[in-house]
Amino acid sequence: MRSAILLVIVAIVAILGFLGVNAEPLPSPLAEPNPHAKAAPLSPAVMASLAG
């Protein structure tokens, strides 16, 4: 019985740690878009390398 409780606690800690490490902050919907940010067009060479 003690081992089952310990296993549950370890599993919860492991899951929370995994989610905490991999959690990325989501962009705020209220944030104003950056007027200085420009989307650079991808060159055909970059597209070819991404496509494989």
UniProtKB/Swiss-Prot annotation:
In-chain residues carrying the UniProt-annotated modification Alanine amide: 51
Subcellular location: Secreted
Leader sequence residues: 1-23
Highest taxon listed in the record's lineage: Eukaryota
Molecular function in Gene Ontology: toxin activity
More info: Not found in venom, suggesting that it is a minor component.
UniProt-recorded name of the protein: Venom peptide 4a
Organism: Eumenes pomiformis
